[in-house]
Amino acid sequence: MDFVGANLDEAPYVRMTQELIKEFPRSGGPFSIEPDASSGSYFWGANSLGLDVEVADWPTTGWQIDAQFTRFISTPREVSRQTDLGDSIMTAIVLAPLADRPISFTDLGRLRVQECERVQALRTELTKCGAVIREEGDTLHVEPSPGMHGAEIETYNDHRMAMCFALLGIKVPGIRLRNPACVKKTFPNFFQKFAADPPRGLGVGIQGVDGRSLSNEELFVA
């Protein structure tokens, strides 16, 4: 199968589709589906924030570009949306102000036309939290920001914005999410996983708008 046209922003996902087509049994039959590496990035991110987390059954085929996320926990100085990470680059961007060195995130144009204008949304909401971040074309330059603090975060009805800033809340007290239910698009039990005791989850306390700790049932987004 050939794909015509150059769309560098989606090239990693085109390659993944090609590999899956090659491997899928032509006459049908059992086929093992890898876990979603993009969603797994939040839990590897929690590990980088000091929680003792191991993500079971992490993808090893190399089909998913976001399976490389573990390589970027050490936060190199430059990360590309085209060649290094896919959607999990948002996780890396939100964690970047906590790093000890400047980091530039490049080739972010595709993020502008997804669930929301994600480049602007990330810059706006991180700035609310005290991050030093500069937008230059399709690049975000993030500086170490030791003065990070809590804020009310607009999620823009974007599941990844909600999950990324929930992760930031592990390290930065006072993060408050508007419309957290938007995670239902891809991960309806995301907050249950955050709150569940290890080894089934992260053991992170989550409170409602009234300051009350939410039960496991209340954290599921239908």
Task: Locate predicted features.
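Short, structured segments at the rim of ligand-binding sites
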Residues: 1-222
